[in-house]
Amino acid sequence: MTPSIIDTHTHPFDAAFDDDRTEVMARAAEAGIATMICPAIDSASHDSLFALCDSYPDMCRPAMGLHPTSVNDNPDWRNELDIVASYISNACNRRFYAIGEVGLDFYWSRNWQKEQTEAFEAQVCLSLEHNLPLIIHTRNAWPEMLDVLRTFKGGGVRGVMQAFS
């Protein structure tokens, strides 16, 4: 019997898979991947995310969020958060399975630490409001991540960590 595996974080909708996406998805299924949680990165990723989930409805589950590096040097990041909140509030009649990919990433720079932290906190609040788990991305920001999560201690925050250092 092949194991039934859930991949809690994957981006097969990325353009890097445009040439062999069908084969990638078939290999995943053959390997026992039953479900893939596919987190958004920013609004530029939404169309390809939704197309993938529509093409593989029995396997792919969308997650909605704003990746921390999509906040960097982006004057419209608050608008991006509004788009995330609108989708989560069911503006598109889709079910989302998590809030993600969210978090803090200071690997490249700390110049946007304040903005990333604000965006992450807002998305933690969204996850609590809608009772959805988080898909948390953390690079070179572990102490700061713990500081944010501690502010929600006892509040029911849940999810998975990925890309952490």
Where are these regions (language model features)?
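Mid-domain alpha/beta scaffold segments of enzyme catalytic cores
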Residues: 1-165
